[in-house]
Amino acid sequence: MSRNILFISVQTIKDRTGLHNNVDDKLINPEILTAQDMYILPALGTGLYERLQTGIQDQDLTNDEATLLDTYITPCLVYFVMSELPMGLSYQFYNKGMIRKTGEGQENPSASDMIDVADRYKSRAEFYKQRLVKYLKEKSGTNIFPLYNLSLIHI
């Protein structure tokens, strides 16, 4: 269940990628939440996912949870968000329908170009997701992330 608690900030994405600072945060935040729900939740399992959300909200993450979030989840999520952004930033809905944003004096990428960019970032994200899952599996024999171990039973 999504509680609108983001694992990363818009600024984190801007700091780690080529995303320009003038991109409106309101256009990025929904993509963060969507990427968390679509890609991170299945990797973590519901129990661990919700525990991290609660830990962020209550500011009581353990050191192991903070390491998981900072070292493994953040890079994965950054690139999943970047893989979702090309279409989300180029096409927007207004009261007259969907339009494609264009800028004067600029060459607009084709839909094929945007798909190529999205695929590039998704490839990076999949690398980091595999690393995240490997880390969690390595720790599954310990009691560091018991909620992850419980979620494995229900998969």
Q: Which residue stretches match the model-derived regions?
A:
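Ordered, amphipathic secondary-structure segments that act as subunit-interaction surfaces
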Residues: 84-85
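Conserved short "hinge" loops at termini or chain/domain junctions
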Residues: 1-74, 88-96, 100-153
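Catalytic-loop motifs flanking and including active-site residues across diverse enzymes
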Residues: 77
